[in-house]
Amino acid sequence: MSEIRTLGEFIVAKQHDFPHASGELSSLIGSIKLAAKIVNREINKAGLVDITGASGEENIQGEQQQKLDVYANDKFKSALEARDQVCGVASEEEDEAVAFNKELNKNAKYVVLMDPLDGSSNIDVNVSVGTIFSIYRRISPIGTPATEEDFLQPGHKQVAAGYIIYGSSTMLVYTTGNGVHGFTYDPSLGVFCLSHENMQIPKDGNIYSINEGNYIRFPEGIKQYLKFCQESKPEDNRPYTSRYIGSLVADFHRNLLKGGIYLYPSTQAYPNGKLRLLYECNPMAMLIEEAGGKATDGEQRILDIKPSELHQRVPFFVGSTNMVNKVHAFLDEWRD
């Protein structure tokens, strides 16, 4: 039996990857790990206690907040503030960025952006959900409160990114720019154990993930790509398989392991796309590039986009490199 390596042990062993971090980044990831355990425990009680369903509030995008959205947001925010490595957070569930005002927090080097509970509307039907996080070094002077500019950095400035998937097992997957590593939660020990080291996505795949119910509203290039996916060409391993869970973390995780592409294009209802650049697209783009894949908005690399606002939306195409390139070819051919 191979030796079990916990997330904490792995982070310590990889400390040399952060020559300027002095341990703060490792401790910060430890804060995320702690909050993930708390949220995981609560999710596992869904259906037994009154934590599912709508909270009665809306977020800044006008979307109905679920009770667990609010719960997860509060737990991650509290855990990050308590460790003093973070000067502020921005969340999909918060209208504005939150600057932590304790003196120790003002002296912290990092800001965190997060989607505390992606796919939360799936909770009450027992479908996998997740947490997505992104970490940047602040650009405002240390010793002062965090500013909005600390959060409006292009994705290639991220120092770490990852997600937690709460599914049949709970996994934390993260990168610090030195490979993508996955840790599975052992509830009997209360620790995350290394289960997937140096994860790599296949260059090609035969899975495509998109909400085909919106087909009539898609750009022509996407419609033509979907026809290509469904065409019978055994020599090209087509038709491809359609798999869409409706939870970005779950769809992304499957495609990362098996090879595939996730697509959320612009539509008539969402001409700029629906997914948020800062909370969803940037962290997933960093992960996929570290795993050998590709992420774009249909025109440019996601990680090169300079954000203009906290809740900015973009079209999103992420997955196996050859599949993303094929989507680009269709978009270019059928561009208006």
From Swiss-Prot:
PROSITE patterns: FBPASE. One of its GO terms (biological process) is fructose 1,6-bisphosphate metabolic process. Mg(2+) 1 binds at residues 92, 115, 117. Its EC number is 3.1.3.11. It is an enzyme of class 3 (hydrolase). Disulfide bonds: none annotated. Keywords: Carbohydrate metabolism, Cytoplasm, Hydrolase, Magnesium, Metal-binding. Binds 2 magnesium ions per subunit. Belongs to the FBPase class 1 family. One of its GO terms (cellular component) is cytosol. The gene is fbp. It comes from the Bacteria. GO terms for molecular function: fructose 1,6-bisphosphate 1-phosphatase activity; magnesium ion binding. Pathway: Carbohydrate biosynthesis; gluconeogenesis. It comes from Aliivibrio fischeri (strain ATCC 700601 / ES114). Transmembrane segments: none annotated. It catalyses: beta-D-fructose 1,6-bisphosphate + H2O = beta-D-fructose 6-phosphate + phosphate. PANTHER family: FRUCTOSE-1,6-BISPHOSPHATASE-RELATED, SEDOHEPTULOSE-1,7-BISPHOSPHATASE, CHLOROPLASTIC. Substrate binds at residues 118-121, 211, 244, 262-264, 274. Mg(2+) 2 binds at residues 115, 118, 280. This is Fructose-1,6-bisphosphatase class 1. Homotetramer.
